[in-house]
Amino acid sequence: MGAQETREDASGSSKKRQRPESEVAAESDAAASSTAHAEKFDELNLSSQTLKAIGKMGFTKMTQVQARTIPPLMAGRDVLGAAKTGSGKTLAFLLPAIEMLHSLKFKPRNGTGVIVITPTRELALQIFGVARELMEFHSQTFGIVIGGANRRQEAEKLAKGVNLLIATPGRLLDHLQNTKGFVFKNLKALVIDEADRILEIGFEDEMKQIIKILPNEDRQSMLFSATQTTKVEDLARISLRPGPLFINVDSEKETSTADGLEQGYVVCDSDKRFLLLFTFLKKFQNKKIIVFLSSCNSVKYYAELLNYIDLPVLELHGKQKQQKRTNTFFEFCNAERGILVCTDVAARGLDIPAVDWIIQFDPPDDPRDYIHRVGRTARGTKGKGKSLMFLTPHELGFLRYLKAAKVPLNEYEFPANKIANVQSQLEKLLKTNYELNKIAKDGYRSYLQAYASHSLKTVYQIDKLDLVKVAKSYGFPVPPKVNITIGASGKAPAAHKKRKLARD
């Protein structure tokens, strides 16, 4: 991030001194090569303020992605990075960005010099937290704009001058188009984090508009993506300068998941799924555990149920208000032990400390989602953790896809006589508790709808589900009557009608 110089005139605006390309290239290569083999942060040409902050954070040695990425970024190169979650890439892009703002002596009146775009509000808050620690001893300003937050307060802060801005795509585009006093003409660097996820959740058009609005003259850009798709390549083409440096720290590894991760699966009929989960959570309630489910309604039901039967859990899903999601996220982060029941909203990029177990209670959509889910544990260079995936007998075909994606799993077995048989109590509870019964029915319907929407139709076939057994896992002795709609037609598939999924 050192290919240009900025100086302020009397009015406080930034003026660029254009430098010959040969001078920039030579300086770039020299700077990159001088730190190319650095392993520790103090071997990089960092400011004393940044080194002090890194020391306070407890970091000394760089992860592989940091060692490969930071030197070329500090030398001004555009970077396209492929790194699995838990690799330390947040520090890899924030550190050079902060150093650049420091070296150019950015002040609030210069406006925004760096923008970091990230897919979710939780991930934005996470990056904001890291930025706050890194910038503790710097004078530059930093801020965050995310959907669900107070837009007017954000606009006021932008007008005062935010040098480093972390944002979600929709809210950023809103401010770029509508906020007077938002100075972004001096933008020097753009970071797109979790690019594949940004595109997966439907922000392709917003990203194209954002790229079009932002100044691109002499702008350094970096794009990080856990997976490389055609759409990611298209976004890279319009956002990065020609000839970016491609860094893939995972290509030489034998596995696609973290080295310190023990991974297993258990084969379990649908009617025994909750009983096994309950037994497992009871046994390990002194650990830190994340349980993934496929829908918001399923999360709401199982969280309500577990809390009701005195197994305290936290819940995190997309239907919660932003403040509730933020509070839950930080409460779980700060806890030494506990259980978080959540949807995939928490699966990407969030850095939750010291997670012992990842439980995939509902199956992931594909191997990529599996990898992102288990990326919540065994993070960093020496991280350790375990994961357990629940599969029914007819879902075992998913293991072939995981094997092809270089994911090593072992089968775990749980003795049938050790599984707590609370089925009759569960059914009795739903019979007498109207509210819980209603939430359970919503969860059951949403589970079926999510199942029918799976992309791997050869593995997840709704016709092969035993609805009586599925209903039992939600506490119903017989399947409740529900209506599910799939696709744009708004009609339930013929297979569902045959299974007598009637009106709610």
Swiss-Prot record:
Its EC number is 3.6.4.13. Residues 1-10 have a biased composition (Basic and acidic residues). Residues 260-430 form the Helicase C-terminal domain. It is found in: Nucleus, Nucleolus. The Q motif is unique to and characteristic of the DEAD box family of RNA helicases and controls ATP binding and hydrolysis. ATP-dependent RNA helicase involved in 40S ribosomal subunit biogenesis. Required for the processing and cleavage of 35S pre-rRNA at sites A0, A1, and A2, leading to mature 18S rRNA. This is ATP-dependent RNA helicase HAS1. The gene is HAS1.
